């Protein structure tokens, strides 16, 4: 499934937060004590989040916590020496789609899977409502060399959020 990366691969996770989702992803990708040899580069802007991620990494070899701004990958990109096949972004900043496209162009392999968790409330949108925002994001992704495999409304879990499952084709 495109929603999960291949076991033992290297993934980039932008907007790692306190590590709840990272912990579940780690179990799949790395296995107990990293028996699969996977690696998660987990980037977050908040020092409090990094503290929690660093604590989590002590018991999870292969988890690399990074204090950094997802928009400024020149500052932390050296920690991702090769392109990845799977990238997940869950940042609460305006310009989410631009951050995602830039990161994917820099770090995601062609034919790689990129997941964008888009929060409508984080955008400075002056258009005709959330549906128009989500449609404009789809258009921008397609125009930037991504195929949209699926868009999943997260209503009931996270209101006003859509998860875009994309494949980089250019």
Feature names for model-found ranges:
Residues 1-6, 80-81:
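Glycine-rich helix-loop-beta junction characteristic of Rossmann-like nucleotide cofactor-binding loops
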Residues 6-19:
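Conserved class I S-adenosyl-L-methionine
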Residues 9, 38, 112:
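Glycine-centered, small-residue-biased loops immediately flanking beta-strands
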Residues 18-35:
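Conserved SAM-binding loop of SAM-dependent methyltransferases across substrates and taxa
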Residues 24-28, 99-104:
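A short acidic, amphipathic alpha-helical/loop segment
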Residues 36-44:
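Conserved SAM-binding motif I beta-strand of class I
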Residues 43-96:
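S-adenosyl-L-methionine
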Residues 51-55, 101-169:
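C-terminal substrate-binding/active-site "lid" region of AdoMet-derived donor-dependent transferases
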């Amino acid at each position: 499934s495109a929603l999960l990366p291949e076991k033992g691969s290297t993934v980039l996770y932008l907007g790692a937060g306190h590590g709840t989702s990272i912990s579940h992803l780690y179990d799949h990708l790395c296995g107990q004590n990293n028996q699969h040899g996977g690696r998660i580069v987990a980037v977050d802007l908040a020092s409090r989040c990094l503290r929690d991620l660093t604590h989590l990494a002590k018991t999870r070899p292969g988890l690399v916590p990074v204090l950094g701004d997802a928009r400024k990958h020149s500052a932390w990109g050296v920690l991702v020496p090769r392109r990845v096949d799977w990238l997940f972004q869950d940042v609460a900043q305006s310009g989410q789609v631009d951050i995602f496209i830039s990161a994917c162009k820099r770090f995601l392999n062609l034919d790689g899977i990129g997941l964008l968790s888009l929060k409508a409330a984080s955008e400075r949108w002056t258009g005709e409502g959330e549906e128009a925002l989500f449609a404009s994001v789809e258009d921008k992704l397609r125009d930037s060399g991504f195929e949209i495999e699926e868009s999943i409304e997260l209503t009931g879990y996270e209101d006003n959020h859509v998860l875009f499952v994309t494949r980089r084709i250019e």
